[in-house]
């Protein structure tokens, strides 16, 4: 028994989730009457629902409070590229959702009533009101817009705090992240239960829907990595970007694909920047910063799954509302850094714009975890490789201006 336990501990989480998916499918086909097994999935999603608001608040406030004043480098352009790249990724995801509309199979209660917004004006009004919600109430009711706004305000206020206070905030963020890690480590069991419930209630044919969802997610990320990012690079450097793009994907993206953490890939990215010959004063700041705010892959995940939920519930959406969703997704994605599956936990932020309840949004998160074996790896690979790419092209443009 101990040997089995030791073997299980040594197996990576991504392999455990894969095993869980296979077992869940088999149980759903062979023993669909084990309805009590569904409670494990409900407990897993419940744990995520409980910790998600606190996670967003802790990470965002800690990140803002610890930001340092940049040296005389090209950090301004890098930050602009990070933010623009994340927004561009979110916008591409919206366009993809229009071209390839998805629907999800969710356990929607019969008496569920949705309150879809009537155009962008109502969405914007709702957004403003949520911004000023009581911070305690925002955490308790999972008002993620309010949580984000208060986290930013607290982070800015804490910039002037003592080192001891900042250390306490950092410790609180680390503790919250550790709790999330513990919950995420239960993902194989939770996902096994979620897959079992889905198969036992809807049949094997439901897997084709998830296959299409994976194809849309991965296809969108590949389009951003191989078309959008090179286009941005061409506009900045006026040079063929593909040798650099492919090197970043090969030497940074490949490692990030398996670690599934932008934060864990920081040393790899710094070593790559050194190999390329970039300034240490620049990349020592830009790479850790990119692991926090350069979240194009996360923005894609948030938008694709949110709009899939919108299509599932038949909620009408105009282009201006979709544009606002892109902005919200880009801002929300900044809170996903360094946490496995972090982008999935931020889907309720975007869902709340369309009157989708937190309970239903967390079901969408559950779907995200089922496809997360591939989605999270591809997302992290895109996020982390783009950190090096944008740092390199910004420095290239910086030295061109110096020579001119």
UniProtKB/Swiss-Prot annotation:
Compartmental location: Cell membrane
Catalysed reactions, as listed in the record: L-serine(in) + Na(+)(in) = L-serine(out) + Na(+)(out); L-threonine(in) + Na(+)(in) = L-threonine(out) + Na(+)(out)
Family matches, as Pfam families: SDF
Keywords linked to the UniProt accession: Amino-acid transport, Cell membrane, Membrane, Symport, Transmembrane, Transmembrane helix, Transport
GO biological process: serine transport; threonine transport
Membrane protein topology class: Multi-pass membrane protein
Entry's transmembrane regions: 17-37, 39-59, 75-95, 138-158, 179-199, 212-232, 287-307, 313-333
Protein's UniProt keywords contain tRNA processing: no
Any single Gene Ontology cellular-component annotation: plasma membrane
Top-level lineage group: Bacteria
GO function terms (MF aspect): amino acid transmembrane transporter activity; symporter activity
Family: Belongs to the dicarboxylate/amino acid:cation symporter (DAACS) (TC 2.A.23) family.
Free-text function comment from the UniProt entry: Involved in the import of serine and threonine into the cell, with the concomitant import of sodium (symport system).
The protein's name in its UniProt record: Serine/threonine transporter SstT
